[in-house]
């Protein structure tokens, strides 16, 4: 009788949440968006990822090792079939799927997307905590450089002649890397090609498009390519800008190296 009672209590204990500080790390984690994919490939333990989202394959972007990660197709049926004990998603993605999973009792954790460099470590610590990892593993922020009024000007140029100004995450990355932002206006601004050619930046950072498009015609203007020659057109994966995370410090480091090479 006592043995049977002990067995029953042990079985019930397995269904109850662990006490404070005793929660077991999740064993089957599923991501619903690209940024969550990336942070999981950085910090999840071997075998802890049940599946990543289909976004990396769809857009040809993946952080960390390219292959070997299981993926789901984004459907409710397939995610449920994975039996996840934790689903990770950003605040602006897969909202309908997230709600349906929550309605079915699946634990969904919505992470905070960093909007400043100071928030990158906060985001990283949050994810480490959700995975049962050590939050102290979050990367230390890159130190701020000394103010240099003679620092070269860098233009971050997007499609349709839209440039990134001050008061933006991208602008903060530029300054942390020791550049001056070419565009001193706040936010995102449409450039005038004549004004740009008359006063060109030291370099242009351009995310190369996957395929030719009219939206990229501004960047291909002959006059612009003349005043800013090919060696001063810098290229990075645009997804590294759209998904702030610990890899952002790699981007800062890359921009710093380019700045040093231009001296």
Regions found by a protein language model. Give the residues of each.
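Structured C-terminal subdomain patch of bacterial secreted/periplasmic proteins
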Residues: 27-28, 95, 118-138, 209-263
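Short helices/loops that flank or line small-molecule/ion binding pockets
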Residues: 75-84, 104, 192-203
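Alpha-helical, coiled-coil/dimerization segments enriched in small aliphatic residues
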Residues: 53-58, 65-68, 164-189
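N-terminal export leaders
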Residues: 4-8
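Basic- and aromatic-lined ligand-binding clefts that recognize polyanionic substrates
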Residues: 27-44, 130-178, 241
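A short, structured surface patch at a secondary-structure boundary
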Residues: 27-92
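Short helix-initiation/N-cap motifs at beta->coil->alpha
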Residues: 67-77, 94, 114, 186-194
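N-terminal signal peptide c-region/cleavage motif recognized by signal peptidases
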Residues: 18-19
């Amino acid at each position: 009788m006592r043995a049977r009672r002990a067995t029953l209590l042990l079985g019930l204990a397995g269904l109850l949440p662990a006490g404070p500080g005793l929660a077991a790390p999740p064993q089957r984690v599923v991501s619903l968006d690209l940024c969550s994919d990336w942070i999981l490939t950085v910090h999840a333990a071997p075998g802890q990822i049940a599946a990543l989202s289909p976004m990396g394959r769809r857009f040809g972007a993946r952080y960390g090792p390219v292959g070997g990660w299981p993926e789901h197709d984004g459907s409710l049926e397939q995610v449920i079939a994975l039996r996840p004990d934790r689903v990770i998603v950003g605040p602006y993605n897969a909202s309908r799927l997230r709600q349906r999973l929550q309605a079915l009792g699946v634990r969904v954790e919505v992470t905070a997307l960093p909007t400043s460099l100071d928030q990158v470590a906060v985001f990283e610590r949050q994810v480490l905590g959700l995975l049962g990892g050590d939050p102290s593993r979050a990367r230390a922020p890159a130190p701020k450089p000394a103010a240099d009024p003679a620092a070269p000007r860098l233009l971050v140029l997007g499609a349709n002649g839209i440039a990134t100004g001050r008061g933006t995450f991208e602008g903060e990355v530029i300054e942390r890397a020791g550049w001056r932002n070419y565009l001193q206006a706040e936010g995102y601004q449409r450039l005038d090609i004549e004004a740009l050619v008359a006063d060109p930046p030291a370099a242009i950072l351009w995310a190369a498009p996957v395929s030719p498009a009219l939206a990229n015609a501004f960047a291909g203007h002959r006059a612009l390519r003349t005043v800013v020659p090919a060696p001063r057109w810098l290229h990075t994966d645009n997804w590294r800008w759209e998904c702030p995370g610990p890899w952002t410090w790699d981007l800062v480091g890359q921009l710093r190296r380019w700045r040093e090479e231009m001296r």
